[in-house]
């Protein structure tokens, strides 16, 4: 398995309440493994690895649990938390692979596809789905965007898309993604919506 070239860190945001799901989404088993473990396995090549979640809620070997700086404020706040933690350990700057906990089809190969686009001058790398929309919850962000994330949150903005609109973004076209990862953006919002073909 190809390793992600350094310096790349990883974070999974798992601080949500799972209200629509009806149970703890991160621990729901798909293909015999909890969603949290499936997403984490796709990011094994990255370091450091951070789980954005309440302290003590989950046990994920090899991952540091970092509590949300703004609990209950959504994934943009989770991204801020991860970037803030990175800034404390690596102020020189690096890339962060940021993933939601409900994407069971993420793979190391998908992340490698994104890292290949992380060139100089870029602030984020994201893929496009079949409708041409960006997918901010399975994307790369440069640690230098922390101030922009915090400014959005301070101003009451919670949408991940609002961040991408303000960044220099490299986009991976859907045709390239679909050729090897056609189900990568299928997420699990409610139990009846479990994607088929997960093994």
Region spans (language model):
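Nucleotide and nucleotide-moiety/phosphate-recognizing core
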Residues: 2-160, 165-184, 192
């Amino acid at each position: 398995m190809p390793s992600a070239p350094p310096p790349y860190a990883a974070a999974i945001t798992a601080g949500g309440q799972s209200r629509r799901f009806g149970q703890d989404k991160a621990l729901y088993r798909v293909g015999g493994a909890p969603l949290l473990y499936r997403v984490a396995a796709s990011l094994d090549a990255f370091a450091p690895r951070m789980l954005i979640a309440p302290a003590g809620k989950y046990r994920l070997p090899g991952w540091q649990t970092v509590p949300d700086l703004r609990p209950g404020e959504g994934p943009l706040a989770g991204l801020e938390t991860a970037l803030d933690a990175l800034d404390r350990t690596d102020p020189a700057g690096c890339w962060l692979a940021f993933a939601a906990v409900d994407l069971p089809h993420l793979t190391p190969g998908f992340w490698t596809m994104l890292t290949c686009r992380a060139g100089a001058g870029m602030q984020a790398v994201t893929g496009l789905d079949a409708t041409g929309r960006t997918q901010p919850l399975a994307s790369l962000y440069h640690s230098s965007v922390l101030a922009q994330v915090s400014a959005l949150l301070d101003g009451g903005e919670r949408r991940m898309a609002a961040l991408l609109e303000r960044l220099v973004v490299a986009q991976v076209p859907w045709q390239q993604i679909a050729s090897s990862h056609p189900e990568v953006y299928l997420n699990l919002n409610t139990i009846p919506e479990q994607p088929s073909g997960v093994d």
